[in-house]
Amino acid sequence: MVRYRVRSPSERPHEEYRQLVNWQEQGRNGQEEQGLSAEGGEVYGRTHQGYSSYRRRRCSRRRRYRIHRRRSRSCRRRRRRSCRYRRRPRRGCRSRRRRRCRRY
């Protein structure tokens, strides 16, 4: 199991954090050139490791199972049908009808 660690602002010196904020604002405003400056690149390299994993969190097996289970439960709810379709006898095998839910 992999644990992701995000650095909090309190862990690093306040000056370094202030530099990071200023560097990000410059990049957004388009004042800085396309390439990273030596100082900015260094700060980016340090923070990028911590925050990239925080942004992209992979779907765990347990979470996928939970999502799938929730969907299959909602499939079982009976949908209301209009009067003319209610009394129509079923045709074919019932197991075929169930298979529709397993696609998800």
UniProtKB/Swiss-Prot annotation:
Proteolytic processing into mature chains is required for histone eviction during spermatogenesis. Transition proteins (TNP1 and TNP2) are required for processing. Testis. Residues 23-104 are annotated as: Disordered. The keyword Heme does not apply. GO terms for cellular component: male germ cell nucleus; nucleosome. Residues 54-104 have a biased composition (Basic residues). PANTHER family: PROTAMINE-2. This is Protamine-2. It comes from Callithrix jacchus.
